Amino acid sequence: DGAAMGQGSLSDFRLLTSVVTQLEGGVFFNVGSAVILPEVFLKALSLARNLGYVVNAFTTVDLDFVRHYRPQVNVVSRPTQQGGRGFHITGHHEIIFPLLCAAVLEALAETEDTPTERRQNA
């Protein structure tokens, strides 16, 4: 049923756009999508900005085992031209993604320490 598929696609795009409107100061990961998600993400970001949301200072990450043109341009480069940073990480998802998650969790745990605890541990 084409109408139902179209409605589902519109619903998904609205949901993605609502998340992108809150991306300021956050991180967007593109994991393994070489064509569709980079295009849809860039359109959702453009819509959010055109609606007046401030979405400039954030980080984007393209994680894939091969570099592709669209993610490099539509995830790493163009979205962060007004601020923020973009990264491309090349490697196998099953290795890189768990390592990246562990690094983020470790960094978050370090920032949760109070200044007193940090001095005592130094």
Indicate where each model-derived feature is located.
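Thr-Gly-centered strand-to-loop micro-motif
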Residues: 30-32
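Active-site-proximal segments of catalytic enzyme domains
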Residues: 3
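C-terminal functional extensions of proteins
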Residues: 6-9, 15-25, 34-122
